Amino acid sequence: MSPAPACPLERVSRSSAVPAHYDLRDHDVLDGLNRMVKAGKTRYIGISNCFAWQLAQANALAEREGFAKFVSVQGHYNLIFREEEREMVPYCTQENIALTPYSALASGRLSRLPGQNGTKRASEDAYAKFKYDATAEQDNVIIARVAEQAEKHGVTMTEISLAWLLTKVTSPVVGATKLHHVEGAAKAVELQLTGEELAWLEAPYLPHPLAGVMAQNKPNNAKEKHVWSTGDQKIGS
């Protein structure tokens, strides 16, 4: 974000979406974002890593004050981490709020079988390991099903994983550092999985404890260093 000189945006990060541990009932935060919209600095505002009740409170305040409301939410959501389906997905569906999740491929885990040649990031990304290693055994059951579906359709695991996600959200955030990453994401748009195939991919899923940013989304953690910068916070609900 690049705050306009006249806007009281000191409490809003210049480089990221509004962190969830801001008090989103805070009039000044929402007023500052609204001024950005009115000044033409941005057309719409979105939010990342929040609970559905936090988003509901923020938009209720915005509506009452005549401020711009959050029109999209970016959360952690993929085939092996589906906790957003509990409240956020149905809430956003009802309120017509766009879902644009990150970690669509679970840091590459949904693009290849365990043990296959991975990327340098896959071997060195401590934050991704923090998010996924604790549940690897149960997640690998789903990953194996993704591989089986990919073989059946003659496509990549990336295409299967993203095709599943595209049935749930507005548009996923997909990282790409090579041409085939872009090609795989584009092909997923054309891949249509049947209802039976979708259900089969989903069936082994078990509830996951919150990890990373959302595990830290508590009032008493507001002054802690962000989990992605330290990697030492414990997983918890």
Model-based region annotation:
Residues M1-E83, E87:
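Glycine/proline-rich, positively charged
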Residues L9-R11, A147-A163:
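Acyl activation and transfer enzymes in specialized metabolism, enriched
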Residues R25, I45, V73, C92, ...:
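Conserved, mostly hydrophobic/aromatic
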Residues L30-N34, L55-N59, V89, I143, ...:
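Generic structural signal for well-ordered alpha-helices
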Residues F51, Y77-F81, S103-L110, W164, ...:
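Glycine-rich beta-alpha junction loops
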Residues E83-R121, T156:
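Aromatic-lined glycan-binding groove of carbohydrate-active enzymes
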Residues Q94, G118-E148, K152, T167, ...:
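Terminal-tail/helix-coil boundary detector
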Residues S171-H181:
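Glycine-rich phosphate-binding active-site loops on the catalytic face of alpha/beta enzymes
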